[in-house]
Amino acid sequence: MENKKSFFHLHLISDSTGETLMSAGRAVSAQFHTSMPVEHVYPMIRNQKQLAQVIDLIDKEPGIVLYTIVDQQLAEFLDLRCHAIGVPCVNVLEPIIGIFQTYLGAPSRRRVGAQHALNADYFARIEALNFAMDHDDGQMPETYDDADVVIIGISRTSKTPTSIYLANRGIKTANIPVVPNVPLPESLYAATRPLIVGLVATSDRISQVRENRDLGTTGGFDGGRYTDRATIMEELKYARALCARNNWPLIDVTRRSIEETAAAILALRPRTR
């Protein structure tokens, strides 16, 4: 029988695409087989206003914070705020930059995204990342037909991290929460361009992830129904029926990593063209 895994929040903050952070976070997370990260990815964070909004989200769902921000004032602001709310915060690149500076006897350029060549592929990824952030969690439904992929699913089926992962590969991705008896936007049904795909998981997996969210939430949140397995099963039944009715493919993410889920979505795309 498979051991029950625990979940923790992993916040990844980058002033560029976030790809470096995602690779580092997953490489380390893979060393801890009994715990699985709930990833929160925040790319293109380049000013204090954006960073303050991210910190508010971290405060609601505390966990490990990894970041790659070359602006030292922003990095110090993040460090101070994370210390104030009691969460660990690590600048992933800073120790490496320090070693390079010492060995080479020269300061770094401190340039955002310096590891990326400024070619068409890079700009396509930036455009896709901006699109994914603008269309996260049901936002901007009027432009769904501009998407390459639209992901739908109930809460805690990895919609956002999958969207960001696809965006890092230049795939414009929107995601929409599925809530029983709440109609999806008409613009989704009218869209002819994107692949629309549903994500599901077992009720046990979703309940475990939601329980972790509940524990990290300060007052005013009634997690009873949110984490109740019977309620989750009804949500999943509704989502499955919705996808079946519209001939939208379903992917079960229970035992899939974000990379595997994204690969499964990409494998479906040629059939839709």
Curated annotation (Swiss-Prot):
Pfam families reported in the protein's UniProt record: Kinase-PPPase (PF03618)
Enzyme class: transferase
Known function: Bifunctional serine/threonine kinase and phosphorylase involved in the regulation of the pyruvate, phosphate dikinase (PPDK) by catalyzing its phosphorylation/dephosphorylation.
Assigned protein family: Belongs to the pyruvate, phosphate/water dikinase regulatory protein family. PDRP subfamily.
Residues binding ADP, per UniProt: 153-160
E.C. no: 2.7.11.32, 2.7.4.27
Catalytic activity: N(tele)-phospho-L-histidyl/L-threonyl-[pyruvate, phosphate dikinase] + ADP = N(tele)-phospho-L-histidyl/O-phospho-L-threonyl-[pyruvate, phosphate dikinase] + AMP + H(+); N(tele)-phospho-L-histidyl/O-phospho-L-threonyl-[pyruvate, phosphate dikinase] + phosphate + H(+) = N(tele)-phospho-L-histidyl/L-threonyl-[pyruvate, phosphate dikinase] + diphosphate
Protein name: Putative pyruvate, phosphate dikinase regulatory protein
Lineage top rank: taxon: Bacteria
GO molecular function: ADP binding; ATP binding; phosphotransferase activity, phosphate group as acceptor; protein serine/threonine kinase activity
Keyword Kinase recorded: yes
Keywords: Kinase, Nucleotide-binding, Serine/threonine-protein kinase, Transferase
